[in-house]
Amino acid sequence: MYTDFYKLNRNPFEITPDPYFLYATKEHKEALAALYYGVRQHKGFVVLTGEVGTGKTLLIRCLLQLCKGSDIASAYVFNSRLSTLEFLQYAATDFGLSATGKHKGELLHELNRFLLVRHQKQLTTMMVVDEAHHLSTEVLEEIRLLTNLETADEKLLQIVLVGQSELSDKLDSHELRQLKQRITLRAYLEPLDFEDTKGYIQCRLQLAGASSGTACLFPDETIARIHHFSRGIPRLINTISDNALITAFARQLASVSVGIIDEVADELRLGVGRSRSVCVFQTTKGADQTLSVGQSLLQLRHQY
């Protein structure tokens, strides 16, 4: 639609999580380094949280891609509205195990045997659970019990829980106090500040084939308005920017004005609120891996 008019080779503001378009802020690099470190060092439980649309699923897809082709076998559970049995069946199937018709005890036995064989070969096994804030207390407790699968010196299964901020509240509950005690690393994705919002928009335009001239599609005052309405949430930045380009294209305009952003925000019924501010926590060793993870992200982008 507007891609030809603005000489782009693809839509720069798709809301589908695509590692090719990852704009890695300092916080994103630190969070990814912390997750990767936790898995590599067999820490057991790692948690990633953030508000809706801040890029959690995209970051996890980058983690899965970084682990792909290595000694790390991964199961990715993204349907969190499952019973305990369904969850175990889903995880076992994603690990390549036969789960059809098996009851809970049989599934646990299969998983334990699978993990022990991999451990004996000095291989790492990771389970990523997305949308974990929707998990029932019963399923979360079952996940905790999976970390009982261990040797005398380390956990056999590395678990990454990913969810909205409500996940942290759920993990603070009395019923899940034992699970909370087993969490060794936490990372939180903050919304973007103005400078990162500007860098995010420019990066996506460039990756979509924008020339230096086309990169001026969004003047600073326009980006400031996008940041104002989006509150720095990448998903909203994409939605606003995409709609703004459609409007600008319809009017055959060379750039997006502040007025267009106001129109789009009004049509989308976007209000302004304060986002929750939480610091990212990571270990020192996790921070040491930030540079190497950043280099890996560049290599990852070239795969797409």
Predicted features along the sequence, with ranges:
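Mid-core helix/loop region of P-loop NTP-binding domains shared across ATPases and GTPases
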Residues: 83-84, 99-142, 151-154, 193-197, ...
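Short regulatory helix/loop adjacent to the ATP-binding pocket of P-loop NTPases
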Residues: 64-67, 167-182, 191
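Sensor-1/coupling segment of RecA-like P-loop NTPase cores
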Residues: 47-52, 58, 106-110, 134-139, ...
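Trafficking entry modules
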Residues: 2-13, 18, 23, 256-304
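C-terminal helical "lid" subdomain and adjoining coupling/linker elements of P-loop NTPases
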Residues: 20, 152, 210-283
